[in-house]
UniProtKB/Swiss-Prot annotation:
Residues 158-167 have a biased composition (Basic and acidic residues). InterPro entries: Oleosin. It is a multi-pass membrane protein. Belongs to the oleosin family. Residues 46-117 are annotated as: Hydrophobic. Residues 151-173 are annotated as: Disordered. The chain crosses the membrane at residues 54-74, 76-96, 97-117. It comes from Arabidopsis thaliana. Residues 1-45 are annotated as: Polar. This is Oleosin 18.5 kDa. Keywords: Lipid droplet, Membrane, Transmembrane, Transmembrane helix. GO terms for cellular component: membrane; monolayer-surrounded lipid storage body. It is found in: Lipid droplet; Membrane. PANTHER family: OLEOSIN (PTHR33203), OLEOSIN 18.5 KDA (PTHR33203:SF25).
Length: 173
């Protein structure tokens, strides 16, 4: 009932534009002529589906036939020329790989040299603080190792002298 007060979808769009929608279609089907309408619609759907499916089936079969023909023609050529083509392809792949890697290593080297230059001139590039702290840690560890070596060296040589004194100064070999 509320639809009649505000108007239906058909009243807003206009009945002339879509004559077989909503209540009109329901009345048409109830009059007995609607079964013909739905059957013709089903036939149209089926015809469209058969046409689309058939054309796709034809296209896929043409693609398959084209692929088989291309392989039939290309396989003997590939077999005949494989002693030439395979080494040539390997050579080309190695050349491309070599040029790309040398270019990448060159860019990396330029970047490293630029960073070292900035660091040496005192510009403090990114990461230099980490390098300085690592250098300080390494220096302190090296100093600790040197001190321990001197301590154990003195202890070791001092220990032999103590043993020699207890034996009366005689060295045994």
């Amino acid at each position: 009932m509320a639809d009649t007060a505000r108007g239906t979808h058909h009243d807003i769009i206009g009945r002339d534009q879509y004559p077989m929608m909503g209540r009109d279609r329901d009345q048409y089907q109830m009059s007995g002529r609607g079964s013909d309408y739905s059957k013709s619609r089903q036939i149209a759907k089926a015809a469209t589906a058969v046409t689309a499916g058939g054309s796709l089936l034809v296209l896929s079969s043409l693609t398959l036939v084209g692929t088989v023909i291309a392989l039939t023609v290309a396989t003997p050529l590939l077999v005949i020329f494989s002693p030439i083509l395979v080494p040539a392809l390997i050579t080309v792949a190695l050349l491309i790989t070599g040029f790309l890697s040398s270019g990448g290593f060159g860019i990396a080297a330029i970047t490293v040299f630029s960073w070292i230059y900035k660091y040496a001139t005192g510009e403090h590039p990114q990461g230099s603080d980490k390098l300085d702290s690592a250098r300080m840690k390494l220096g302190s560890k090296a100093q600790d190792l040197k001190d321990r070596a001197q301590y154990y060296g003195q202890q070791h040589t001092g220990g032999e002298h103590d043993r020699d004194r207890t034996r009366g100064g005689q060295h045994t070999t």
